[in-house]
Amino acid sequence: MATTKQKVTAPSPSPSSSTASCCPSTSILRREATAAIAVVGDGLQNWTNIPSVDEKQKKTASSALASLPTTEPLSTNTSTKGIQIMTRAQTCHPLDPLSAAEISVAVATVRAAGETPEVRDGMRFIEVVLVEPDKSVVALADAYFFPPFQSSLMPRTKGGSQIPTKLPPRRARLIVYNKKTNETSIWIVELNEVHAAARGGHHRGKVIASNVVPDVQPPIDAQEYAECEAVVKSYPPFRDAMRRRGIDDLDLVMVDPWCVGYHSEADAPSRRLAKPLVFCRTESDCPMENGYARPVEGIYVLVDVQNMQIIEFEDRKLVPLPPVDPLRNYTAGETRGGVDRSDVKPLHIIQPEGPSFRISGNYVEWQKWNFRIGFTPREGLVIHSVAYLDGSRGRRPIAHRLSFVEMVVPYGDPNDPHYRKNAFDAGEDGLGKNAHSLKRGCDCLGYIKYFDAHFTNFTGGVETTENCVCLHEEDHGMLWKHQDWRTGLAEVRRSRRLTVSFVCTVANYEYAFYWHFYQDGKIEAEVKLTGILSLGALQPGEYRKYGTTILPGLYAPVHQHFFVARMNMAVDCKPGEAHNQVVEVNVKVEEPGKENVHNNAFYAEETLLRSELQAMRDCDPFSARHWIVRNTRTVNRTGQLTGYKLVPGPNCLPLAGPEAKFLRRAAFLKHNLWVTQYAPGEDFPGGEFPNQNPRVGEGLASWVKQDRPLEESDIVLWYIFGITHVPRLEDWPVMPVEHIGFVLQPHGYFNCSPAVDVPPPFACDSESRDSDVTETSVAKSTATSLLAKL
């Protein structure tokens, strides 16, 4: 379910409202200036053909767009035929997330397009996101309009280089739920950036397309969760059930609505449903009281979320509240024994010359890496256009787009209510929508660049989550070292990585998502799991093998967490090129014989994954299995194809039986790796709308039935990685972070180690002796007898 987060909220716009430009500092193109560069067209078709143009001319042409006056007065012509409009230079990169202004205009445009007042009044806005343009548009922007300003990114044409005068308008995609009709629709709005003499800078929207999507339910919104909790707590039979359990103060009661999933026809998307879980806090005067320590069980509630009515209620079984746990809380001063550690000294991260990264809008450069940062309500952090600056070979692409597109959490207890706890946290709630405002010194350390995120709320207003994405450098221990044993001379380098991250809360759990970029060309994807266990209550003397007893009457069910990373790769591929393939590598043991007389031989065997059905693969640690994405037309100095390999970390597969109900919607969990040929609209492994989805195997499992060829293609990797959580007492009351992830590592991509040119550490052999630890600096133990007992 959704959670409260720090936001700045703007009111819902009316259809006629005007908003500020997304980039108010950008220059205005004069009407006269357009003639100097070309007649401005409506899209990519209006380009100026230049059959032969050298690099100097290209720079001159592209700089002409950026060097126009910023203080040019507006026209004072006030014709009665309409407001005078002046074309603006492109101010937002085609991959930049929608600004607050763009979201407001998109919402207002859709609301104004409603056919009747009833339709307009019933509109609720689930999601407003950028329609990501074709890769050729991205190449165009990166060549002439925005960093890295590299015209070599443009595909070669017979007519020579082409310099455009403008980029096509940005577009927004809206998922709209109509609360009155229970219909879900998708809208596409074109956002034209204009400037009007009377109203100042703003956007103008135009509906390009709209359609109603039948037989689906979109994600549940945070406002719906809050309303659902209030409806349940005010329901008289529910209040009676609480009194039967000795709960008179309803302010102590927590109602966490969960999506119902799809277990039978009763869960069909013809109704918008939620089945809440109920908990009870012990104290009301503690703002961080751990209410999850006392689950209230034996009560069945089904809520019609569309009409906010309880349609089914049953007090099935009186399960006593678990006893009050003195170890339930985790805030400072309320931990075990009520004493916090006193021997933790300050640790400061100091960069006296500032960071090594450079930021231009959403464009990031660091240690030969460059990429763009995006963000969506569903996925959260998105990394675009990943490339590496490789000396004379220039900017070499690695991936078009990297993101986490889904996560599924199935529980292993067959008893009610735990058997129906199968959360799709991205598709049913939204990872980005539940992201936090991060705090300096707590979530990130060092010299930090934050990025805000803008969303629509349920009624169409704009909400801003400040400091939503954190970007910073981290020391990461040793990068490489060698000491010559003959001379005693040594060379050592310390590793540094650039980390981009965000953190979200979904009900009781926290998930922190990271993309790490390393100096040796490696990219690491990491998820950190923490938060509070989802617990169950037990009858006196009861024991369940499907979980871990926390204390008598309270237990934590076993469960699994699965994450799906979607990676549209581009190893040495310019936008528009489709020259990648995937090979699987298994290390084989040589059979004894004349080729293996010493019985010690083993070797790596490669298998080309030729089609999508062949590319449904699982991890195999016994053969050190990994997969390499290679460019079919680029070689290294040995003549081998350049590539990047996916190296699995610890992983698992679903432990539920093959007929488990949640696998109807999560068939993609049946394999660790899927490979598909890129196709627009194939974005989420369980389909666009997994909430209450009755269709078996929608999404990835259906797409691969086309069995498209992969031998030379635009490749998308879908890597599913999971963890099986058998709870420990040490996971209570709040879980220490659990790490899970994988690595993308260069494999024949470079001609040698890209990390050999990292300079020696600045502090090597120059550390002050004052930093050496002596016996006198060792802190005395502060353990008390009470702490020792606990």
From Swiss-Prot:
Residues annotated as binding Cu cation: 559, 561, 725
Pathway in which this enzyme or protein is active: Alkaloid biosynthesis; nicotine biosynthesis
GO molecular function, one term: quinone binding
One GO term (biological process): amine metabolic process
Disulphide linkage map: 444-470
Post-translational modification: Topaquinone (TPQ) is generated by copper-dependent autoxidation of a specific tyrosyl residue.
Active site as annotated: 425, 509
Subunit structure: Homodimer.
UniProt similarity note: Belongs to the copper/topaquinone oxidase family.
Protein name: N-methylputrescine oxidase 1, peroxisomal
Source organism (scientific name): Nicotiana tabacum
